C-alpha cells in the first residue's frame, strides 16, 4: 500500500487551505472531482496524482475549476454514464456540468492555472430551501437525488433534469444518500436518527412529475442502530455494497460505542456492527468491486474462491479503517490521516485506490497492490450477484419478500410475449436491442449511425462516401453566397418621408428551421423502419389520414351567421374588424434562422425536376350558396401545381410534399392548372419520372388526394373525380353543394368538407355513405350569439380534418379542441380541450407511456386470424394522444392558458374546492376511457383503464371502484337464459363479448390485481378475486407489466 499526499492537491487560499467537503472519481477513473469551502469544484487528473513523485512527469495536474456556486460546496458526484458532474452547495442550488468539446477560455483576474478541459454548467436545479448536503445518481443515470438541511429528498430526472418528486419523509436534516446497485431502492440518512428506504422504478427519459405519483414509495424505516447517535456529525454518508446485500450506515451506535451499522437487505435490520472508531463516523464507502479471498486459478473452472466486499470508513477520529466481510477485524487502520475530520471517501472503478478528503484541506490517496485487499473479481461477478434482485430486468419490480412473491405468482403467463408487445413497451420493458436502436429524448431528433451490410467486400456505407463528399461541397459554396446576401440585407438603406436615411429592420422567421420539443407522431404506413430507427424522437402509431399541405398555418378561417343578439349590448361598443380586412399572410419574411446565423429567405430552387409549391393563380369562383349558408369556410385558391405522393406520405426529416416527391419509390399525383381559366386542367400520375396515366378536366383543380385503392381530385365547380390506380374512372363525377375546402382519404374511405361546412364521407368500396352530410356548425360555436343578427362573425378555424381506418371523422380547431363524429349517435363528441390541459394531473403531451414508443399491439388471443387481430389493434390508434398534443400546441404554447390557470388556482384555494384538481384528473381519465371506447382504440383503452383503476384505488373511491368492477364483469357469470326482449347494450352496458377488443375476464383480472394492494378496498376486490378463481397457484403474473405510471 502506498500513501500519496501531494502538496498541490488542495483547495488553496491566500492565507490557508480551504476545507474539502467532497470528492469523487469519474467512471473511467481518469478524473478526480473535489469540492471545497472556496466555492470551487476542481477536476484533477488521477494520472498526475499517481505520478506526484515522478520528476519527469509534466502533464497537467488540474484539468478544470468551476466557481458557479455562491458558498461552500458540500457534495460533488459524477454520473455513472460519465456524461455529467453534479455539485450541491449551501446556496440551495445544484449545478450540473457537462464536458464541452470546444476549447476552454482563460479566466480573467485569477491566479488559477488555465483550464485544460471545458466543463460548462448544463443546468441549475432549484428545489431546496436550505443547504444541499449530499447527492447521488442512480446506477443507470436515470435520476439524480439530492438531500439537504431542509429535510427534503428531491428527485430529479437524469435526462431533462426536471423535478420529478419531493419526498418530505424525514423530520430533520438529511445528510446522506446512497443507491442500490440493482436499481430498485435508494436509502437516505437523517438527523432524525433514521434511515429510510425508498423503492423506485427508473423513469422514462421524458417523464414528468405527473408520471411519478406512484413512484418513489417509502419501503421501510430503520431506526434501531441510531437511537442515541450524536447529532454533531457534518455528514451521514452511507453506502450500498456492490452485490446489493448490505447497506453500511455511518454514525451508528452499539451501546455507548460509535460504530458503522451493516443493514441487511430485505430484512432491513442490523445485526452486524463495525466497532473500532473512537468518535462518530462521517462517511463509509464500499469498494465498487468484489474481491476473491485467494488468487483464482484459471485452470480450475469448477471452484472459484469465495467473494468478499471491502468497505472503508472514516470520521471525526481522523482515522481511516478498511474492512472486508471475511474478517472481524479491520484489514488496514490509518490513524491521524488528517488534521481534522475526514469528510468523504471515493474509490476508483477498479477498486484498488481510495481517495479521502478532509476538513483540514488535504486530500489523501491510498493505493493498494494486488492481493492486499484481495484479488479483484471480474465485473461479471457483480452482475451475477445482482441477478437475484432483478438488476438486469429493468422496471420489472421483482418481488423481494414473501408477499411480493405471492403477488407475482398470481399473474398470468406471457412475460416474454409482453416484452415484444406494445403494452410491454408502454410499461418500459423494452429489450436491449430496441433501447439501443431507438433512444428516446424529449422531443428532439438526432440520428444514430447505422451499419449497412457489406457487398463484395465493400460496405454500402463506403459506397455512399463519394456522393456524400460531393454534397458536402455544395453547402460550403452556398455558405459564402448566403453570408453575402445576409450582409446585403442587413445594410439595406431606406429613405423615410422626412428625407432621413435609416437601415431597414429585418424580420427573422424561425418557422423554416425551428423544431418543436413535442413528440412527432408518425403516420401508419408512411415511415420506413430505417427512418424510424435513426430518429429518436418519440413515436407512436397513428390511425389517421395524411395531413393536407394546402391548409394555411392558422387553419381554415370560418365565418358564422348569427341567429340571436347578445344580451346587454352597449351602443358604444365597436364592431370587430372584419376578417377580410386583416392581412392574410402577415409581413413578408426577409431572412430566416439558420443553423449558425440568419439566412436569406430565398425561394427553394427546382430540384430533381420537381417544381416547388407555387403562388396561387387566382381565387376560386365562389358558389352562390355560400351567401345563404350559416357556416362559411375559406376556399383554397387556385394553384398552378398541386402534388400528392401515394400513401407513403412525408418521410421523417422531410419538411414538405416537394421533398417527399423526390423519393424515387413514391408515385406522384400531379395536377396542373392553366393560368387561363378557359383552358382544361391536366392530371398526371408518374413514378420515377415515367408517366403512368394522364387525363384532362374542364375545370380548375383545387385539391387532390390518393390511397392505394383510388385517386381523387376536387374541382372549382364543386365536383369530385375518382380513378382506380390504373387510371380508370371509378365513379361518375360527384357533385357537391359548394367548393371543397378539405379532401382526405384513408384506405377506401374518402372525406370532403365543403365551403358551407358540410362533411361528406363515402365508402368507395361499397359505393355508399355511412351517414348523411354532417355539419361542422355545432363544433364551430354556431349556437353562440353574435353582435348582429344578419352579419357573419369569425369563429374558430379548422386546423385539420382526418379519417381513421373505419371512416370516422376527426377534426381539430384553432382553439385547441379536438372532435370526433359518432355516426351511431349522429353527434359530435369532444375528445380534447383546454380544460383538461390546465386542470388534470394526467395531461402530458410528452407522455412516455404513449408517445415515446412504437410497437405492435398484442392482446388476448382472438378467434379471428392474426392479420385481422393486427388490423383491429391499430384501429384509432394514437388519436387521443394526437388530439391532446394539438391542444397543447394551440392553447398552452401560445400563452392563452394563463387566465384559466389563474382562475383554477383561485378556486383551489377555497375550502369547498380543495379537491378540484383530483376531481378534474379523474374526470379527464374517464373522458379518455369513454373516447377510446367510442373510437375502438383498444391499446389506449387498456392503458387508460389501468391508470384509472390505480387512481381510484389511491383515492379510495369505493363506490366508483365497485361500479367499474361490475361493468367489467358484465355477463361473464350469467347464463344465456335471459329474456329475449331485452336489447343488448353497448360499451359499459354490454353484457357479452369483448370490451373494446379485449377479453372482459382478463381485463377484470388485471384491474383486480391493480386494486389488490389498497387495503381499504381489499374486502371488495377479494370477492371478485374469488369469483375469478384467482389463487396463489395460478401461475406467474407480471404485475409490473399491468402497472401504469400515473
UniProtKB/Swiss-Prot annotation:
Biased composition (Low complexity): 444-455
Chief site of localization: nucleus
Superkingdom, natural source: Eukaryota
A molecular-function term among this protein's GO annotations: nucleosome binding
Any one Gene Ontology cellular component term annotated for this protein: HIR complex
WD repeats: 15-54, 68-107, 127-166, 169-208, 230-273, 292-333, 337-378
Matches recorded under Pfam families: Beta-prop_CAF1B_HIR1, Hira, HIRA_B
Keyword Flavoprotein tagged: no
An annotated GO BP: DNA-templated transcription
Keyword Transcription found: yes
Keywords: Chromatin regulator, Nucleus, Repeat, Repressor, Transcription, Transcription regulation, WD repeat
Places the protein is found: Nucleus
Region (Disordered), start-end ranges: 426-497
Family: Belongs to the WD repeat HIR1 family.
Protein name: Protein HIR1
Organism: Gibberella zeae (strain ATCC MYA-4620 / CBS 123657 / FGSC 9075 / NRRL 31084 / PH-1) (Wheat head blight fungus)
Amino acid at each position: 500500500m502506498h500513501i500519496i499526499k501531494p502538496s498541490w492537491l488542495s483547495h488553496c487560499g491566500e492565507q490557508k487551505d480551504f476545507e474539502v467537503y467532497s470528492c469523487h472519481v469519474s467512471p473511467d477513473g481518469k478524473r478526480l472531482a473535489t469540492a471545497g469551502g472556496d466555492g470551487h469544484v476542481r477536476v484533477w487528473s488521477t494520472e498526475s496524482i499517481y505520478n506526484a513523485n515522478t520528476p519527469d512527469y509534466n502533464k497537467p495536474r488540474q484539468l478544470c475549476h468551476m466557481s458557479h456556486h455562491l458558498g461552500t460546496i458540500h457534495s460533488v458526484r459524477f454520473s455513472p454514464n460519465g456524461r455529467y458532474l453534479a455539485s450541491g452547495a449551501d446556496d440551495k442550488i445544484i449545478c450540473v456540468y457537462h464536458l464541452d468539446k470546444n476549447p476552454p477560455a482563460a479566466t480573467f483576474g485569477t491566479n488559477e492555472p488555465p483550464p485544460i478541459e471545458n466543463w460548462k454548467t448544463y443546468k441549475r436545479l432549484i428545489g431546496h430551501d436550505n443547504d444541499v448536503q449530499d447527492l447521488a445518481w442512480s446506477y443507470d443515470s436515470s435520476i439524480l437525488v439530492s438531500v439537504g438541511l431542509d429535510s427534503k429528498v428531491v428527485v430529479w430526472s437524469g435526462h431533462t433534469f426536471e423535478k420529478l418528486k419531493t419526498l418530505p419523509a424525514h423530520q430533520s436534516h438529511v445528510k446522506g444518500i446512497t443507491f442500490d446497485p440493482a436499481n430498485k431502492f435508494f436509502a437516505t440518512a437523517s438527523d432524525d436518527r433514521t434511515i429510510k428506504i425508498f423503492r423506485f422504478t427508473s423513469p422514462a427519459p421524458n417523464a414528468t412529475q405527473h408520471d411519478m405519483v406512484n413512484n418513489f414509495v417509502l419501503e421501510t424505516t430503520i431506526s434501531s442502530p441510531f437511537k442515541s447517535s450524536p447529532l454533531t456529525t457534518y455528514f451521514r454518508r452511507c453506502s450500498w455494497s456492490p452485490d446489493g446485500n448490505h447497506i453500511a450506515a455511518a454514525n451508528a451506535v452499539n451501546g455507548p460505542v460509535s460504530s458503522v451499522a451493516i443493514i441487511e437487505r430485505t430484512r432491513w435490520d442490523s445485526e452486524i456492527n463495525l466497532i473500532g472508531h473512537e468518535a462518530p463516523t462521517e462517511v463509509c464507502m464500499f469498494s465498487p468491486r468484489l474481491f476473491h479471498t485467494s488468487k483464482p486459478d484459471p485452470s480450475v473452472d469448477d471452484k472459484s474462491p469465495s467473494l468478499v466486499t471491502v468497505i472503508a470508513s472514516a470520521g471525526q477520529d481522523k482515522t481511516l479503517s478498511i474492512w472486508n466481510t471475511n474478517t472481524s477485524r479491520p484489514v488496514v487502520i490509518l490513524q491521524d490521516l488528517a488534521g481534522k475530520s475526514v469528510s468523504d471517501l471515493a474509490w476508483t472503478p477498479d477498486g484498488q485506490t481510495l481517495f479521502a478528503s478532509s476538513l483540514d484541506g488535504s486530500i489523501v490517496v491510498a493505493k493498494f497492490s494486488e492481493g492486499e485487499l484481495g484479488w479483484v473479481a471480474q465485473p461479471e461477478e457483480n452482475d451475477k450477484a445482482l441477478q437475484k434482485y432483478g438488476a438486469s430486468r429493468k422496471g420489472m419490480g421483482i418481488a423481494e419478500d414473501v408477499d411480493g412473491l405471492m403477488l407475482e405468482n398470481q399473474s398470468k403467463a406471457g412475460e416474454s410475449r409482453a416484452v415484444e408487445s406494445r403494452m410491454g413497451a408502454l410499461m418500459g420493458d423494452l429489450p436491449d436491442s430496441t433501447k439501443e436502436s431507438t433512444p428516446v429524448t424529449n422531443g428532439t431528433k438526432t440520428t444514430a449511425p447505422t451499419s449497412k451490410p457489406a457487398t463484395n467486400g465493400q460496405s454500402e456505407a463506403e459506397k455512399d462516401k463519394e456522393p456524400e463528399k460531393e454534397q458536402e461541397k455544395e453547402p460550403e459554396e452556398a455558405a459564402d453566397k448566403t453570408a453575402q446576401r445576409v450582409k446585403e440585407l442587413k445594410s439595406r438603406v431606406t429613405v423615410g418621408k422626412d428625407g432621413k436615411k435609416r437601415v431597414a429592420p429585418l424580420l427573422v422567421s424561425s418557422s423554416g428551421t425551428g423544431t418543436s420539443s413535442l413528440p412527432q407522431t408518425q403516420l401508419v404506413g408512411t415511415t420506413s423502419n430505417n427512418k424510424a430507427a435513426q430518429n429518436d424522437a418519440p413515436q407512436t402509431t397513428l390511425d389517421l389520414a395524411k395531413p393536407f399541405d394546402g391548409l394555411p398555418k392558422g387553419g381554415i378561417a370560418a365565418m358564422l351567421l348569427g341567429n340571436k343578439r347578445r344580451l346587454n349590448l352597449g351602443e358604444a361598443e365597436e364592431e370587430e374588424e372584419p376578417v377580410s380586412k386583416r392581412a392574410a399572410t402577415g409581413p413578408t419574411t426577409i431572412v430566416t434562422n439558420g443553423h449558425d446565423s440568419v439566412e436569406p429567405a430565398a425561394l427553394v430552387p427546382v430540384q430533381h425536376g420537381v417544381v416547388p409549391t407555387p403562388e396561387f393563380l387566382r381565387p376560386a369562383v365562389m358558389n352562390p350558396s355560400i351567401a345563404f349558408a350559416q357556416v362559411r369556410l375559406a376556399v383554397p385558391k387556385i394553384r398552378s401545381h398541386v402534388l400528392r405522393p401515394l400513401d407513403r406520405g412525408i418521410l421523417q426529416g422531410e419538411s414538405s410534399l416537394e421533398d417527399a416527391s423526390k423519393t424515387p419509390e413514391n408515385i406522384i399525383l400531379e395536377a396542373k392548372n392553366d393560368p387561363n381559366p378557359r383552358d382544361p386542367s391536366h392530371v398526371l400520375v408518374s413514378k420515377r419520372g415515367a408517366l403512368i396515366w394522364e387525363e384532362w378536366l374542364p375545370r380548375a383543380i383545387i385539391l387532390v388526394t390518393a390511397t392505394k385503392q383510388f385517386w381523387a381530385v376536387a374541382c372549382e365547380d364543386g365536383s369530385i373525380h375518382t380513378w382506380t390506380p390504373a387510371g380508370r374512372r371509378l365513379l361518375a363525377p360527384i357533385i357537391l353543394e359548394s367548393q371543397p375546402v378539405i379532401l382526405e382519404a384513408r384506405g377506401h374511405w374518402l372525406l370532403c368538407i365543403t365551403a358551407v361546412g358540410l362533411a361528406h364521407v363515402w365508402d368507395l368500396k361499397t359505393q355508399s355513405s355511412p351517414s348523411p352530410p354532417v355539419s361542422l356548425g355545432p363544433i364551430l360555436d354556431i349556437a353562440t350569439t353574435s353582435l348582429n343578427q344578419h352579419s357573419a362573425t369569425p369563429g374558430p378555424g379548422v386546423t385539420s380534418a382526418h379519417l381513421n381506418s373505419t371512416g370516422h371523422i376527426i377534426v381539430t380547431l384553432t382553439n385547441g379542441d379536438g372532435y370526433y363524429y359518432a355516426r351511431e349517435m349522429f353527434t359530435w363528441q369532444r375528445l380534447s380541450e383546454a380544460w383538461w390541459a390546465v386542470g388534470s394531473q394526467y395531461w402530458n403531451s410528452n407522455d412516455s407511456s404513449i408517445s415515446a414508443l412504437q410497437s405492435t399491439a398484442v392482446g388476448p388471443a382472438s378467434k379471428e386470424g392474426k392479420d385481422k387481430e393486427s388490423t383491429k389493434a391499430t384501429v384509432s390508434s394514437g388519436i387521443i394522444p394526437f388530439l391532446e398534443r394539438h391542444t397543447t400546441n394551440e392553447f398552452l404554447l401560445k400563452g392563452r392558458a394563463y387566465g384559466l390557470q389563474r382562475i383554477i388556482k383561485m378556486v383551489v384555494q377555497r375550502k369547498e374546492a380543495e379537491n378540484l384538481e383530483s376531481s378534474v384528473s379523474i374526470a379527464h381519465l374517464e373522458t379518455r376511457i369513454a373516447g377510446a371506447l367510442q373510437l375502438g382504440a383498444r391499446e389506449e383503452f387498456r392503458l387508460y383503464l389501468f391508470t384509472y383503476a390505480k387512481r381510484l384505488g389511491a383515492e379510495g373511491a369505493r363506490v366508483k371502484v365497485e361500479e367499474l368492477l361490475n361493468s367489467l364483469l358484465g355477463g361473464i357469470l350469467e347464463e344465456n337464459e335471459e329474456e329475449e326482449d331485452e336489447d343488448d347494450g353497448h360499451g359499459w352496458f354490454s353484457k357479452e363479448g369483448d370490451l373494446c377488443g379485449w377479453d372482459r375476464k382478463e381485463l377484470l383480472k388485471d384491474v383486480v390485481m391493480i386494486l389488490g394492494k389498497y387495503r381499504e378496498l381489499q374486502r371488495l376486490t377479494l370477492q371478485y378475486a374469488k369469483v375469478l378463481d384467482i389463487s396463489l397457484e395460478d401461475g406467474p403474473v407480471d404485475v409490473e407489466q399491468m402497472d401504469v405510471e400515473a
